[in-house]
Amino acid sequence: MKPFLCFDLTNDKKNSVPNGEEFIAVKPSFASSQSLEDSKSDANEKLEQSKLPKPLRILQTVCGFAGFIALVGFLRSTATLSEAYQNAPFIFWIIAVCLPVWFVLLMLGLYRKKKVLSTEESIHALESLEGRVDAIYSELGVPENSRDADILTFFYKTKGDKIKICSKGAQIAPYLNPIYKVFADFENLYIVELGGKYVIPLSSIKGIRTVKKHIRIAKWNKEAVFNKGIYQQYKMNTDQYGTIHCRYYHIMEFELGGEAWEMYIPCYELPLFERLTGVKAQ
């Protein structure tokens, strides 16, 4: 089966086109796409201006890492304060210098970000981008009652009939979870991103199966906390990199264009897709 919305690097390590583009029924106009890119460029410029200069950001990272490592080492030590200083005085110097530098740079960064992003130019750039995004979704026919949903994607290579998930660049988790607009009618499931609207006939869906396998996904996109409220039942946790650990996931199987496809769904999105498709997971 072919993984939907995932990236096949078997024959092209630089491939950036996801599987399933042939199922895009509607794309935004060239003018809309160009306006979006212009707005993205303006917004990204303002966001970049809101950051500290790169050398200071590097210094902040180095000081923070070194300071906290030294602090953890000191706290775990069973030696007395005087013994610890005699054995490793440099640890005290690292803590005394690095942590204050890290904290000062953190505060400066927050101040700079707030100052730059509160200017009229920055506000206009960000509002313009939001308006362009809304305009494209409207052009693609996304209704107001559509829902935001994470869908799992990944880079992979094939060997025979087997799929091997791989990383690309400085990727911190094997599974990515971009946000799509999703909705359905009596005939189709619609999956929409700014590049176009995918259409999957409900009649093509063969089932949803549960895969009881631990996975790590890139980040948490929801406003609600991942381990509270409606999400507490999934018993997810996180790590020092901010990735989310899931105990299982789901695969929606469908046949389209003469091929068998699989769409990977994180555990916490299953109720939404069951409701939209009318198919219960097995």
Regions from the PLM with identified roles:
Residues 174-176, 181-225:
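Phosphoinositide-binding peripheral membrane targeting modules
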